[in-house]
């Protein structure tokens, strides 16, 4: 699992959504299947400078209290560290430290023996530790490597591939490499990004979220999908039967197609019903006939960043990837304002 608490500016609705996932799906699955070891691949808390007191209180009551009986290995992600250039000052050491016997913090690279399977862990790589950490990657004898990596060619968000990071060839000696950091679940060759365990923005609406279970006999992971979605996008169809309870306290976007000639008479009633649940946020987008034949069509089911990224590609400007990276960073930062 990776990237857990404090996203969306410590919004209490999102915090409750995150914690419900662990209480209702994650921990019950582990207990039912006799799993005793948990590995967290970084970004336990979202904010590098401080932790919201209510977030910490709820995490202590509803997450950390469930760790009894488990071994919880956690490496540092970039959001866990106060400075970008060193891991020395980090929230996990300062706040959690040795208060929980089940909680095992890895500030340095380490190798675990999981029922005979050798698994190497590498925390966030920065200027201060780069040489030592990369030397560990080049020389450790584990067949599986896990970390919090920025690897070239993998998507930060859909359509935006990372540049100026680590060369993927550095990891070719491992059977499998698993990483936190990037939000979208993705795989290429022997490298796999787990992605976030739950939806955080509308860009996640059509992405599969969840956690991964390691089979120590085969060295392979099984994906366990998180069935609880925070974001819902659909085209209104008065003949479709909706379970409106699925939308309670969720973010909903309804696309009303005025171009098809179909009846949309019931949309106002649906909006009233959803608001009375209530939903956390409701957006209605009406798709009208184009006024001009040459007017460009925009897929409004796509998220903001994907639309911007595609527009940058069409513009054919120099350093397009650098511009996408800047816009992505500004967008992510805006979510925490």
What spans do the regions from the language model cover?
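Active-site environment of divalent metal-dependent phosphoester hydrolases
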Residues: 2-5, 46-49, 75-85, 112-113, ...
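Core catalytic region of metal-dependent phosphoesterases/phosphodiesterases
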Residues: 4-111, 170-174
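Divalent metal-coordination and catalytic microenvironments
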Residues: 38, 43, 59, 77, ...
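Hydrophobic/aromatic residues located in beta-strands of well-ordered beta-sheets
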Residues: 38, 72-74, 119, 143, ...
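Conserved catalytic scaffold of divalent metal-dependent phosphoesterases
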Residues: 59, 80-169
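Short, conserved loop/helix-junction motifs that constitute active-site signature segments
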Residues: 64-68, 136-140, 168-173, 245-247
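Conserved beta-sheet core of the metallophosphoesterase superfamily
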Residues: 151-152, 157-222
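Accessory, non-catalytic peripheral segments of nucleic-acid enzymes
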Residues: 216-337
């Amino acid at each position: 699992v990776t990237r857990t608490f404090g996203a969306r500016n410590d919004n209490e609705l999102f915090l409750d959504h995150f914690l419900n996932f662990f209480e209702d799906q994650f921990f019950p699955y582990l207990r039912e299947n006799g799993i005793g070891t948990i590995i967290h691949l970084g970004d336990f808390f979202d904010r590098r400078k401080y932790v919201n007191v209510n977030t910490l209180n709820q995490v202590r009551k509803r997450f950390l209290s469930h760790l009894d009986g488990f071994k919880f290995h956690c490496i540092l992600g970039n959001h866990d560290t106060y400075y970008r250039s060193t891991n020395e000052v980090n929230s996990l050491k300062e706040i959690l430290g040795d208060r929980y016997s089940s909680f095992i913090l890895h500030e340095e690279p380490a190798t675990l023996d999981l029922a005979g399977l050798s698994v190497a862990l590498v925390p966030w790589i920065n200027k201060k530790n780069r040489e030592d950490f990369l030397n560990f990657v080049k020389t450790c004898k584990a067949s599986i490597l896990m970390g919090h990596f920025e690897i070239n060619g993998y998507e930060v968000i859909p359509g935006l591939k990372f540049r100026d990071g680590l060369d993927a060839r550095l990891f070719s000696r491992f059977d499998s490499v698993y990483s936190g950091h990037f939000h979208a679940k993705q795989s290429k060759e022997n490298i796999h990004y787990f992605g976030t365990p739950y939806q955080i923005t509308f860009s996640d609406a059509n992405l599969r979220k969840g956690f991964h279970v390691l089979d120590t006999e085969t060295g392979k992971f099984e994906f366990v999908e998180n069935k609880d979605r925070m974001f819902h996008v659909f085209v209104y169809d008065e003949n479709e039967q909706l379970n409106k309870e699925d939308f309670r306290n969720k973010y909903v976007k309804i696309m009303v197609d005025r171009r098809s000639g179909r009846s949309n008479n019931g949309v106002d009633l649906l909006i009233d019903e959803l608001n009375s649940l209530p939903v956390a946020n409701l957006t209605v987008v009406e798709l009208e006939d184009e006024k001009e034949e040459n007017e460009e069509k925009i897929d409004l089911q796509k998220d903001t960043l994907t639309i911007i990224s595609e527009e940058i590609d069409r513009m054919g400007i120099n350093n397009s990837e650098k511009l996408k990276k800047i816009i992505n960073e500004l967008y992510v930062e805006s979510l925490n304002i």
